[in-house]
Amino acid sequence: MKALQSRFFFFFFFYIFFSVSVSSEAHRRILHQPLFPESSTPPPPDFQSTPSPPLPDTPDQPFFPENPSTPQQTLFPPPPPPVSADVNGGLPIPTATTQSAKPGKKVAIVISVGIVTLGMLSALAFFLYRHKAKHASDTQKLVTGGGDGGGSRRFQEDSGPPTTTSSTFLYMGTVEPTRVSASESNGGTNGPVNSSPYRKLNSAKRSERYRPSPELQPLPPLAKPPQPSDNSPSALSPSSSSSGEECRDTAFYTPHGSAISSDDGYYTAFPRSANGSLPHSKRTSPRSKFGSAPTTAASRSPEMKHVIIPSIKQKLPPPVQPPPLRGLESDEQELPYSQNKPKFSQPPPPPNRAAFQAITQEKSPVPPPRRSPPPLQTPPPPPPPPPLAPPPPPQKRPRDFQMLRKVTNSEATTNSTTSPSRKQAFKTPSPKTKAVEEVNSVSAGSLEKSGDGDTDPSKPKLKPLHWDKVRASSDRATVWDQLKSSSFQLNEDRMEHLFGCNSGSSAPKEPVRRSVIPLAENENRVLDPKKSQNIAILLRALNVTREEVSEALTDGNPESLGAELLETLVKMAPTKEEEIKLREYSGDVSKLGTAERFLKTILDIPFAFKRVEAMLYRANFDAEVKYLRNSFQTLEEASLELKASRLFLKLLEAVLMTGNRMNVGTNRGDAIAFKLDTLLKLVDIKGVDGKTTLLHFVVQEITRSEGTTTTKDETILHGNNDGFRKQGLQVVAGLSRDLVNVKKSAGMDFDVLSSYVTKLEMGLDKLRSFLKTETTQGRFFDSMKTFLKEAEEEIRKIKGGERKALSMVKEVTEYFHGNAAREEAHPLRIFMVVRDFLGVLDNVCKEVKTMQEMSTSMGSASARSFRISATASLPVLHRYKARQDDTSSDSEHSSNSST
């Protein structure tokens, strides 16, 4: 601000100097004409004396009464011209001549310059007045309490005796209407002294940069230090770094903490010269304010060296929000302790911590609980303070706050005391607190393990029921939607008694079981634990001893063990590494496990597991050979049945005639044969009524034809028409009974049968190679050699039956499909088509039987009309047959003629 004032004065004086120099140059130009005024008459003496006095006074009157400062008076250049005019008073003729030449112009210039100068000085004085008044009010609010007193009252409070302490409060960043005192409006001699403390507090750039929230409440001051004279040099030095570090380490109250607290709080009195942490104004230079008059301020009021303001340690990072919240909680918890501080007493020197704790423990039951004052209310006056209440060290306060946030609500209520010894207990975690935290963590972990994270700890744990839960379906109704929660009540007491997990009974069993298993693992565990356990379970399920297995393997008798046991023994076969370990084991066999003892007993027999495989092959050989023999025999019989079925041939003939009639005039007409796949398409062609299909029509025709051929008596034919129709329907329905082997063959896969034959042949080759090993132990090899001869003969027969069945299947396929049989990928597909058609034919026969029963239940008239319609259909079929013969003969004749 002072740089702005000096710049303004410079431009103003430059303008005044330029205007006066112009007027002086005009005056000299007139005085440089010495011969011209001699011829003129001298002016009267009163004309010279009238305008001469205002010349030296005109530039002096607007400046000197308003600005008493002497350095600004030396900048004015106008005084020399009036002095020269007075010195040259002996030359009246030129002066009278110049003033008589242009008196009006000179007077106008002087008057205008004076008016302009007076106006500018007035504006400057008003600007300085407003500026000082505004900053004086801000400084007054920072130092004084409610703004009820002016600057003189503020200085009286600050310059009082050191034994008294100001009860006013300190504001941070608040703005009130401007208040100007008498001492600030005028620039007296005490201006520098009075402006020094306020300018230091009003160093505006720091205050604007770290301005806190406008919701701050008035904070109580702290007692001043005992001997301020010791810190006066460091307080007044602008470059003090130790005071800046002390200021940064000083804690302060947040707005909410101050609102909830009582009148007293934690404050730190520190030197005002710590410019590194003091706020400054944007419009005032810190150096200019601090350099006003430090020595005078220190000599006149030594108490003004220390100003009670909160520390701005936590204001340094303004974007971070959590630190003020932690400060709020910590301040709320520290308030009861701060109420014990004296308000108007001077604190003694800091005592040692032992004496401090001993004194405060005696006064600890006096203060109220911590959170007793409600938030956002003016607290009542504090109780009488104890004689000693120094603030705690500021370096350890953040740790106190973090510990206070971590404790639980129960610990906070039990520890809500105002003694500093309790507060210091929160600085470092005590062994008791650590023990409580460890117990809580252990109990929480045990609950998670025992309850699996989901169970209710209030209910005892039961045995689990492993089921598959079904998700709720909102689009359909299920049986679970009809269940009600109150429809069935459980006897939970009995359930807990029957299915509860007895931790007391199961706990002793667990160590006993663990003490046995590691012993076996350490001494005699050779196999994999899981595999050993599985083998032991299988042995208990089969209920067989080692001696029985050894005897069967030695004699080669598979009937004594059975195929199931032999399959289990094959699964127990150890790996080569395990076999080597078991063979090389030379310790006590009784110490081995059940599985190890069993396998070691079996491995003592030469080629034990190869014998097991050979015996398993022998046990399954007869069953597999029988299955293959029956399968190939079924295929042979199915081929013969399909070729020899007269009724199936009649059915194919009826379908062929019906198809040719329906395809007359098209490329599909005049067919001689068709694939059996066409039989499955007869049900897809429906009549006009939408119910009768082409297969229904064919069945009815075959029924009528079969009934007439089986009955030779004409009287029976015309008299009992319903009887022969029923008889014909029974003949058609018996087609499925005639082709039983065809249905069986349709479920077979010839490739699978061929793979079974190959497997038997490969097993026989293995057995033959195994019997070539030289050994004389037991009768195993003798019995196996006998079986080998029989097996070779049976396999030759099976392979012959396979070739015969395959040839017959191909023959029957060519019998019905002709040359198209070569295109069949599946050799047994013809049996599958016939099987599917027989199923559809059975359903159609049932429907036709139902229709006949409905027709016979009607009256005689309807029965006679039905007979007429039945007999009338016979000539139609004969005519159709005759027409078909004629058309076929004509087509043959035309083909012969064309050739």
Curated annotation (Swiss-Prot):
Polar residues bias spans: 180-197
What GO terms describe the biological role, i.e. biological process, of this protein? actin nucleation
The keyword Transmembrane helix is assigned to this record: yes
Q: Name one GO cellular component term.
A: nucleus
Which portions of the chain have biased composition (kind: Pro residues)?
40-59, 215-228, 316-325, 365-395
Q: Which domain of life is it from?
A: Eukaryota
Extract the signal peptide range: 1-24
Q: What is its main location?
A: membrane
Stated induction or repression of this protein's expression: Up-regulated during gall formation induced by root-knot nematodes.
Family the UniProt entry places it in: Belongs to the formin-like family. Class-I subfamily.
Protein name, entry field: Formin-like protein 6
According to its UniProt entry, this protein's organism is Arabidopsis thaliana (Mouse-ear cress)
